[in-house]
């Protein structure tokens, strides 16, 4: 992203700040700025250019707990580290941030040291199923036939209410859902239904019956935090994760979903969303911001995993804020900011590829997969080592153009099935842009980029591999970094052992 006079900001931990660092590239090298906070306190990192000077700063809503009651001394519980290097941003990140990341509670374990079901480690493809009608069921079964099964279906609208409303009153479930779950599982696939782990609709029966007002996050004046989404126009309240009322609701939902619907676990949305400072006097945390938000969700998910998650089931969430890596078996990466002036770079896999499983790249198109971004997303998704797809299967066979996109996804899925020796626990090393016959195209919602891209990975055994993907509909002959030529057919990928 180009730096301008308008401040660029990153709200940690959340979708637009998965890690605690900002870097600035220039002709002289890279400047590195990182508040190294092992407690994952909420913070806003800002960078701004004015009159030729660039300023970096961290803004926080302080916790009352940061002031010592005896000495009245106020301490910010982290140290900010800065540095400069003649190399680029990737060198700075690996040199300085990765050692910090591996010293934190969330980055200390490799993927193999975590208790993740083997079936998930071997997963390659996700679908986003919506509703329970015949159109959806037909598309789901066609996807299983077309891609060869072993698909994870992330299921929305399995209850009786519209999106972003009536949270957390999902039960009773639509009676059509459990038989569909059974059918999909009998075909060798998995089903994970959606719930929200952060919002409570104040108009629900449960908000009154379970005293939801005592669980709500509060502003300094005692007012509620409310969020209104265009999907429902409902003023949902933001719930404080420290509340035992809310924790019990989430744990009860986990039990009910698994026991009554027989799913393979559940998806809990917005746990990794940006925290709010909470000033509720009846909550068991110091007023203000600080570490309570992360600690509360960490403890909630630890209890869920220890006492409520059935054998070989999983729990996953949206986005990839680093501190939530141990809380979930896999993270759905779909909200990363991007536009023609803001390009996504492989910063997260550079740091955490051997620590975490992810699926998707950014939001898959909602209505049309033929505009170019779907193909680009899945190329990048593959190269980042992420599990592919997260697409609505109803979109894949509506016409010949859509079928071609489905073919590309199948080609990459079949290739990925043979790469678990690298992608499961391996390290992303570097992005590769082959030269030669490698056209630049204007990708819808992303901007200009090459049709052929690549990446170098290192397997857990230390073996280096290069992947190259051609997202174009014609064959190209390109030159690799070692000077060798590679001819690559349309909508395919290749593995090259180094």
Regions found by a protein language model. Name each.
Residues 1-152, 170, 183, 187-190, ...:
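Carbohydrate-recognition beta-sandwich/jelly-roll modules
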Residues 152-175, 206-241, 274-298:
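Aromatic- and acidic-residue-enriched carbohydrate-binding clefts of CAZyme catalytic domains
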Residues 238-330, 341:
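Active-site neighborhood of glycoside hydrolase catalytic domains
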């Amino acid at each position: 992203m180009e730096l301008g006079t308008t401040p660029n900001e990153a709200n940690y931990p959340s979708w637009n700040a998965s890690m605690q660092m900002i870097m600035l590239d220039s002709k002289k090298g890279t400047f590195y700025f990182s508040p190294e906070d092992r407690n994952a306190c909420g913070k806003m990192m800002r960078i701004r250019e004015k009159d030729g000077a660039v300023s970096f700063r961290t803004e926080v809503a302080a916790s009352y707990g940061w002031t010592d009651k005896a000495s009245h001394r106020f301490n910010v519980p982290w140290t900010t580290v800065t540095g400069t290097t003649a190399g680029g941003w990737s060198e700075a990140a690996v040199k300085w941030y990765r050692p910090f990341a591996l010293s934190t509670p969330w980055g200390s374990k490799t993927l193999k040291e975590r208790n993740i079901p083997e079936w998930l480690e071997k997963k390659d493809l996700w679908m986003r199923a919506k509703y329970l009608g015949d159109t959806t069921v037909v598309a789901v079964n066609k996807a299983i036939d077309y891609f060869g099964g072993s698909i994870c279906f992330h299921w929305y609208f399995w209850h009786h209410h519209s999106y972003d409303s009536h949270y957390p009153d999902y039960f009773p479930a639509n009676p059509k859902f459990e038989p569909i779950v059974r059918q999909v599982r009998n075909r060798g696939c998995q089903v994970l239904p959606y719930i929200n782990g952060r919002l409570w609709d104040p108009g629900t029966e449960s908000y009154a019956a379970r005293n939801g007002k005592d669980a709500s996050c509060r502003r300094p004046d005692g007012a509620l935090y409310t969020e209104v989404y265009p999907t429902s126009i409902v003023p949902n309240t933001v719930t404080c994760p420290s509340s035992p009322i809310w924790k019990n609701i989430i744990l009860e939902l986990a039990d009910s979903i698994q026991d009554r619907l027989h799913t393979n676990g559940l998806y809990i949305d917005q746990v990794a969303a940006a925290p709010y400072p909470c000033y509720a006097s009846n909550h068991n945390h110091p007023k203000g911001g600080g570490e309570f938000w992360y600690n509360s969700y960490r403890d909630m998910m630890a209890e869920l995993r220890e006492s409520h998650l059935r054998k070989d089931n999983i729990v996953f969430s949206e986005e990839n804020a680093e501190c939530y890596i141990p809380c979930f078996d896999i993270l759905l990466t779909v909200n990363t900011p991007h536009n023609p002036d803001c390009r996504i770079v492989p910063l997260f896999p550079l740091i955490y590829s051997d620590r975490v499983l992810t699926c998707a790249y950014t939001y898959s198109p909602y209505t049309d997969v033929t505009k170019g971004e779907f193909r680009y997303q899945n190329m990048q998704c593959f190269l980042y080592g992420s599990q592919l797809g997260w697409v609505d299967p109803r979109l894949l066979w509506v016409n010949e153009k859509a079928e071609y996109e489905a073919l590309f996804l199948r080609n990459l899925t079949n290739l990925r099935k043979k790469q678990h020796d690298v992608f499961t626990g391996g390290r992303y090393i570097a992005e590769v842009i082959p030269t030669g016959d490698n056209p630049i195209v204007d990708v819808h919602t992303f901007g200009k980029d090459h049709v052929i891209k690549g990446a170098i990975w290192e397997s857990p055994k230390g073996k280096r591999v290069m992947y190259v993907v051609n997202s174009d509909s014609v064959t190209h002959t390109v030159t690799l970094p070692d000077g060798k030529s590679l001819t690559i057919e349309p909508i395919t990928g290749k593995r090259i052992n180094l």
